[in-house]
Amino acid sequence: MGKVAVVTGAAGGMGRAIVARLLADGHAVVGFDVDEGGLAEMAQDGFAGMVVDLMEATAIKEAFAEIEGMLGGVDVLVNNAGTCFMSEFPDIPVDEFERQMTLNFSAAFHCCQAAIKLMAGRDGVRKIVNISSNGAYNFDVFDPPHYRASKAALDNLTKDLARRFASDKIAVNSIAPAMTETPLFGVLSEDVLAKAVAQMPHGRAMQPAEIADWVGFLVSPAGDISSGNVIILNQGRDVR
């Protein structure tokens, strides 16, 4: 059997592509999501879906305890879960700000806490891949400030943990994609979406499977020597 991988937001568009890639590479994959029906649709050998509310730190802790009992530990964590609320500053409601930061940053923080403990003593270089966003760096696009802040915080966590656990052979990287065709497109108006896609040099949005291929690379032995990096995927849009 391959490595044990945990993927958050597994039932979403990006999550399904990442799960498919890791399964194809021979890993046992545990997928977290609140979408029980979506997880059920993904049932196949090597995949275990767990209904986990990532807004609750206690639920995250309990889920990893269950994984420890079931599979003995964790080799790979992909923090993929996230959302983008579109309220404009300064009229962002407090609860929306808190939900944005909790799902995009705090959930990943708590998953890292739990996963790193279960990575101790495992063979080889263990991996954490955080799915960030090009929006944390490109201020010419439409992303609202609480979304940018949540993803920038995630990338700082990536760098801190990469340095902190380098000698423990835990490699931590972020992937920061630009426009990728997922259900989150639904939060955008037609004109905003059309303008954003038109800005992409290839004239199209990227596909979840393309991002998943980068996750697969970082998780593979070829990615062992990469840690502390924020890998920006945007077709060269923001080269200066």
Where are the model-predicted features located?
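Substrate-binding pocket helix/loop in short-chain dehydrogenase/reductase
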Residues: E88-F89, P93-M101, F185, A196
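Active-site loop of short-chain dehydrogenase/reductase
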Residues: K3, G73-V74, M119-S133, S167-I170, ...
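Alpha-helical segment proximal to the catalytic Tyr-Lys
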Residues: K117, K159, R163-S167, D224
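Active-site helix of classical SDR
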Residues: C112, S150, T158
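Canonical Rossmann dinucleotide-binding motif of NAD(H)/NADP(H)-dependent dehydrogenases/reductases
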Residues: G2-V29
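A conserved structural motif in NAD(P)-dependent oxidoreductases
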Residues: M200-I211
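Short C-terminal tail/terminal secondary-structure segment
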Residues: G216, S227-R240
